[in-house]
UniProtKB/Swiss-Prot annotation:
Homology family: Belongs to the alpha-2-MRAP family.
Domain of life (superkingdom): Eukaryota
Subcellular location(s) of the protein: Rough endoplasmic reticulum lumen; Endoplasmic reticulum-Golgi intermediate compartment lumen; Golgi apparatus, cis-Golgi network; Golgi apparatus lumen
Main location group: endoplasmic reticulum
Motif stretch (Prevents secretion from ER): 357-360
Expressed in which tissues: Highly expressed in PYS-2 parietal endoderm cells and in the kidney. The RNA level increased about 10-fold during differentiation of F9 embryonal carcinoma cells to parietal endoderm cells.
Protein name in the entry: Alpha-2-macroglobulin receptor-associated protein
LDL receptor binding: annotated span: 240-356
C-alpha cells in the first residue's frame, strides 16, 4: 500500500470518483446475485415513495436486507440494532436523492459515502455472504460470547479479564461492549481497505505507465489518510483493551461507553476552542446517558424474549398473549432508542470531523 500513496493525478475529479464508486458497488456480491432486485431502478424509488403495508422500510433493497437478516436468526437485540442502522441508512439515502435532484452531489462523493456505509452494515451483521461474519452477535453476555470475537488476541484478553476477579458483573458487561466496539472498528477498516484496493486496481488498469508519473489523486490520498486514521484508532483501542483487561477500570475515567471515549479522544485533538470543547464534553455526557438507557432496554428485550420462549413452550394462551404484547412494546422502544443513539452519534462524529478538517 505504501508506494501507492505517492501517486499523482491530473484526471478530473469526477472520473476518479467514478472509479471509487464502481468497486464500492461490487462489494456486496451475494446481493448482486439476486438479479434485478438490487438494480438502480429498484434502489432509487420516487422521492414521494411511501412504505407498503406490512413493510418496515420505504426502500425495497432495505426491506430485502431486513427479511434476509430475519432468516439468519439474529438475536432480538441484534435485529433491533440492524433496524436502527437501516433506518439511518434510509434517511441518509432519501436525503441524498433530494440533493441529487438539486444537483448538489455532482462529483458523487456523497453517493460513495452512502454505498460505503451500506457495505459496513452488510459486514457488521453477516449480510455480505462471508461465513466468518455469520456468527450470532449480541451486546449481552452469555457463556459462548468468547467465540464471537474472531481474533485470538481478543479472545485471550477477554478470557484473562473474565477470570481475573478484577471486574464486577456490571464492569464485565461494559468491557464486553468495548470488545464488540473494537471488533466493529476492524470490520469498518476492512471494508474501507477493500474499497480502496479495488479503486486503485481500476485506477491502474485505466492509466498507461507513462501517465503514472504525472498523476496525483486527491481522492485516493484522502482515502489513504482516512485509512491511516482508522488504523491509528484500532491500535489505540487495542492498547486500551490490554490495559483495562490487565488492570481493571480505574476511578478516574472521564467516560465509560467506548463510542463516547472515542469521540472524546478525537475532540481533544480537534480544532475546538476551550469553550467549544467544554460544551462538547457536556453533550457527550448527555449522549452517554442516552446510550445507557438504550443498553437497559436491550437487556430488558433479551429477558422478555427468553421469558416469551419459556411461556410458549408451556402453551398457556393467556400468558403467551400478555408476554408477546410486552415483548413487542419493548422491541419497538429498543428500535426507537437505537435510532436516536445512532443519529446522535452521527451528528457528534460529523462535528468532530469538521473540526479536525478545519485544523488541517
Amino acid at each position: 500500500m505504501a508506494p501507492r500513496r505517492e501517486r499523482v493525478s491530473t484526471l478530473p475529479r469526477l472520473q476518479l470518483l467514478v472509479l471509487l464508486l464502481l468497486p464500492l458497488m461490487l462489494v456486496p456480491q451475494p446481493i448482486a446475485g439476486h438479479g434485478g432486485k438490487y438494480s438502480r431502478e429498484k434502489n432509487e424509488p420516487e422521492m414521494a415513495a411511501k412504505r407498503e403495508s406490512g413493510e418496515e422500510f420505504r426502500m425495497e433493497k432495505l426491506n430485502q436486507l431486513w427479511e434476509k437478516a430475519k432468516r439468519l436468526h439474529l438475536s432480538p437485540v441484534r435485529l433491533a440494532e440492524l433496524h436502527s442502522d437501516l433506518k439511518i441508512q434510509e434517511r441518509d439515502e432519501l436525503n441524498w436523492k433530494k440533493l441529487k435532484v438539486e444537483g448538489l452531489d455532482k462529483d458523487g462523493e456523497k453517493e460513495a459515502k452512502l454505498i460505503h456505509n451500506l457495505n459496513v452494515i452488510l459486514a457488521r451483521y453477516g449480510l455480505d455472504g462471508r461465513k466468518d461474519a455469520q456468527m450470532v452477535h449480541s451486546n449481552a453476555l452469555n457463556e459462548d460470547t468468547q467465540d464471537e470475537l474472531g481474533d485470538p488476541r481478543l479472545e485471550k484478553l477477554w478470557h484473562k479479564a473474565k477470570t481475573s476477579g478484577k471486574f464486577s458483573s456490571e464492569e464485565l458487561d461494559k468491557l464486553w461492549r468495548e470488545f464488540l466496539h473494537y471488533k466493529e472498528k476492524i470490520q469498518e477498516y476492512n471494508v474501507l481497505l477493500d474499497t480502496l484496493s479495488r479503486a486503485e486496481e481500476g485506477y491502474e488498469n485505466l492509466l498507461s505507465p507513462s501517465d503514472m508519473a504525472h498523476i496525483k489523486s486527491d481522492t485516493l490520498i484522502s482515502k489513504h489518510s482516512e485509512l491511516k486514521d482508522r488504523l491509528r484508532s484500532i491500535n489505540q483501542g487495542l492498547d486500551r483493551l490490554r490495559k483495562v483487561s490487565h488492570q481493571g477500570y480505574g476511578s478516574t475515567t472521564e467516560f465509560e461507553e467506548p463510542r463516547v471515549i472515542d469521540l472524546w479522544d478525537l475532540a481533544q485533538s480537534a480544532n475546538f476552542t476551550e469553550k467549544e470543547l467544554e460544551s462538547f464534553r457536556e453533550e457527550l455526557k448527555h449522549f452517554e446517558a442516552k446510550i445507557e438507557k438504550h443498553n437497559h432496554y436491550q437487556k430488558q428485550l433479551e429477558i422478555s424474549h427468553q421469558k416469551l420462549k419459556h411461556v410458549e413452550s408451556i402453551g398457556d394462551p393467556e400468558h403467551i398473549s400478555r408476554n408477546k404484547e410486552k415483548y413487542v412494546l419493548l422491541e419497538e422502544k429498543t428500535k426507537e432508542l437505537g435510532y436516536k443513539v445512532k443519529k446522535h452519534l452521527q451528528d457528534l462524529s460529523s462535528r468532530v470531523s469538521r473540526a479536525r478538517h478545519n485544523e488541517l
